[in-house]
C-alpha cells in the first residue's frame, strides 16, 4: 500500500485560476510546499486531459510531489500518475486497485459516515470528507456535514481523513482537532493571486508528513 505522506491536498480547477495558466498556478503552489496534487478537470476531452496530466506529471516530478487523477484510471496509468481520486458513487476502489496495483494511491470523496466506511472496506488509502464548511464549489452536495460528523468519522475509520470544503487558515486548527490528517482544498490556493505564499501559510498550520515517517 502506498503511503499517504502529505497533509495539504491541492485539487485543481482551472476555472478558478482567474485566467492564469493552471500549470503556472500549480507550480507556485508546489514551490510553496504542496506535495500532492489532484488533477480534477472533468470537462476536458480525454486527449486534452492526458496532455495536461503528462505536463502536470513532469511538473510534480520536479518538486518530488505526488499526482493523482480524478476518476480516470486510464489517464492515471497513461500519464504515470501516483494514483487516482474516486467519487463516492464512482468506480469502486477495489476495482481501481485491481487495475492500478498496490503501489499507487487511491483516494475517495465521502460525504457521510456510511460512505467513509464503504471506502475503507473497498481498500481506499485515504478519503476526503465534506463539505465540512460552507463553500460554493461544493454546493451541489447540500448543507455542510459539519465538524461533529468529521470528528465522528475520524474516530470510526483507520485511514487518513482530509477535511474538505470551505477550508481556510481560521478553521484548520478545528479540523485537525477533530482528527483530520490534513485538509483538501481548491479555491484557497487556485484562486489566490500568490499561490506560493498561500500554500506556505496553510502548511505552517499543518503537521508535517514525510515518506520517511
Curated annotation (Swiss-Prot):
GO terms for biological process: thiamine biosynthetic process; thiamine diphosphate biosynthetic process. Mg(2+) binds at residue 71. One of its GO terms (molecular function) is thiamine-phosphate diphosphorylase activity. It catalyses: 2-[(2R,5Z)-2-carboxy-4-methylthiazol-5(2H)-ylidene]ethyl phosphate + 4-amino-2-methyl-5-(diphosphooxymethyl)pyrimidine + 2 H(+) = thiamine phosphate + CO2 + diphosphate; 2-(2-carboxy-4-methylthiazol-5-yl)ethyl phosphate + 4-amino-2-methyl-5-(diphosphooxymethyl)pyrimidine + 2 H(+) = thiamine phosphate + CO2 + diphosphate; 4-methyl-5-(2-phosphooxyethyl)-thiazole + 4-amino-2-methyl-5-(diphosphooxymethyl)pyrimidine + H(+) = thiamine phosphate + diphosphate. Condenses 4-methyl-5-(beta-hydroxyethyl)thiazole monophosphate (THZ-P) and 2-methyl-4-amino-5-hydroxymethyl pyrimidine pyrophosphate (HMP-PP) to form thiamine monophosphate (TMP). Belongs to the thiamine-phosphate synthase family. This is Putative thiamine-phosphate synthase. It comes from Geobacter sulfurreducens (strain ATCC 51573 / DSM 12127 / PCA). The gene is thiE.
